[in-house]
Amino acid sequence: MVANSIIRDLNDILKKQLTAINQFFVHSKIQKKNGLLSIAMQYAKLGINGGKTAEKLIEILVDLDELPQIKDYDLLKSHRDIQKQLSFDTALILSMIDSIHKCLKKCKESEELALTTSLSEILLDIEKQSDFLESQLSIIDSIGLNLYTEGLKKPFAISHSK
């Protein structure tokens, strides 16, 4: 039987993932409205990939005979400014990564090998999202917000992530 603290952690990770999905989709729509087409497309993909990750978490919880807490969300942090969007989203993803690491530690200590494997795979997916978001903030720091947003008005200005 899996410890209750691990179940709570899994539901907390799910809550953050569900929040991220909604935040990504809201930001995608704002970006599209502002003509930032390439990053709007990337954000839509982040939301879709986040849905796949949430599905994996739900399957894990169901396999453990637990009811996933899909009604729980954190407060969405949204803004019209692309740099603030990226900052909010990066903070949320980094918080999720921290939660996954804590849960992984408990799983390893409890010798929950199947959970450790599943969470490690999820962690890799989330770290890719973090890499993308942090790289966009780094580009803004390097070239400035004006040049960055001008480049985003082209549909394929940034590389596509999986």
Task: Tell where the protein language model's regions lie, with residue ranges.
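Iron-associated oxidoreductase/ferritin-like identity signal
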Residues: 1-162
